[in-house]
């Protein structure tokens, strides 16, 4: 009797059956969660086996998750691959998690992409959230704030930040007018990024920063390779097999981080050769001094080899966020000329044309400030914070969230929530002005969520806000921006860690008055 007669299944059928069995076992294991009695897991839609909700997220996860939050509430759960992800929406819920329960939500998930950022030692992206991380964060924040508000005795500017921005903004005005005399138009982002990088570079390295370096310009002009890949929900972070398949974007991301780190390592090393602890005038020097006075890692201390990692975080965040904010601002201004006229009128009335705007003018320019706030809210160019992670089992809004659960914070939803904003999809700076139009409504402005909250809140938020204000004030005092008649400006954002505006090659600038 043939052996095959004794077996009810063929080898192929047995293999298929075994595969299905293990697939079902894997899915059941992936979805299984031990929830304490009396508690419940966050709700959410049923996802596909193996891939979860990847297809649901699509190209614009912030929009997809906003739609899901309207159905499932401010605390919902999805899966990317087999990884469960909790998504938080709603300002009150996010404040509860990141501020009132900050110790529970201060972690970072151990994502594959983060291992390439500053050799895996980034203070911003690294999953470490212990005492050493907290001490280094305090140190970086202190150095950043010190050298943004400190002043050079030889300068007429109120602080180093004002001095650097004023100089770079004037250079940018000249550059834009030169482009108008030549090509006759320009693309804003590519012109702005170098000027903004020079500001944060000068803050970090003082006179040692190579402002005209081709290497530096090439790096900052390709920063989109970083922001597009480091976005929340990147499949490479959740599907390990994708790391071994041909992936041009992953390779570009690796190359960018390698070049950026090498550039900063070289700049830090060169700067250290000229370091004088009795003459500290920039962030790197302050970190050098701290390292030499406290060479052993203990509490607030930092070894010198880690300085480049802190500078990497400060420099990287410093130029990308500000560049994106100014780029969006200019595109909104050319599409809404009536708003630009109001800003010009306010600048002329408060500052005139005989002096430059200064940081001290900010309270006297409420419409300008309201415009910037509306740019932040409407564009929400940081749609999510960098993903958080729970550091222990916790309960939020009655839902059980276990330790080490990846958490997305949907800032875009908060900034377009009809419960918080009247006509959220209308660009209207006036919403932020008090009834007499002489001041900004701080209660309303505090509802904008762009820089995160709690123990992971962006350390450069204040610096970034000041920088955006001063750049725009100087540019708009001297220039009027427009596009040629008939040119339509695309305002559809390109999703990423920071959402960039589409390239618009047709922006024009003309001087408002003769110097």
UniProtKB/Swiss-Prot annotation:
Cofactor(s) the protein requires to work: heme
EC number: 1.14.14.1, 4.2.1.152
Pathways involved: Cofactor metabolism; retinol metabolism; Steroid metabolism; cholesterol metabolism; Lipid metabolism; arachidonate metabolism
InterPro entries reported in the protein's UniProt record: Cyt_P450, Cyt_P450_CS, Cyt_P450_E_grp-I, Cyt_P450_E_grp-I_CYP1, Cyt_P450_sf
Chain positions recorded as substrate binding sites: 226
Reaction catalysis annotation: an organic molecule + reduced [NADPH--hemoprotein reductase] + O2 = an alcohol + oxidized [NADPH--hemoprotein reductase] + H2O + H(+); 17beta-estradiol + reduced [NADPH--hemoprotein reductase] + O2 = 2-hydroxy-17beta-estradiol + oxidized [NADPH--hemoprotein reductase] + H2O + H(+); 17beta-estradiol + reduced [NADPH--hemoprotein reductase] + O2 = 4-hydroxy-17beta-estradiol + oxidized [NADPH--hemoprotein reductase] + H2O + H(+); estrone + reduced [NADPH--hemoprotein reductase] + O2 = 2-hydroxyestrone + oxidized [NADPH--hemoprotein reductase] + H2O + H(+)
Zinc-finger found in the keyword field: no
Purpose of the protein: A cytochrome P450 monooxygenase involved in the metabolism of various endogenous substrates, including fatty acids, steroid hormones and vitamins. Mechanistically, uses molecular oxygen inserting one oxygen atom into a substrate, and reducing the second into a water molecule, with two electrons provided by NADPH via cytochrome P450 reductase (NADPH--hemoprotein reductase). Catalyzes the hydroxylation of carbon-hydrogen bonds. Exhibits high catalytic activity for the formation of hydroxyestrogens from estrone (E1) and 17beta-estradiol (E2), namely 2-hydroxy E1 and E2.
This protein's name: Cytochrome P450 1A2
Species whose genome carries this gene: Cavia porcellus (Guinea pig)
Lineage, broadest ranks: Eukaryota, Metazoa, Chordata, Craniata, Vertebrata
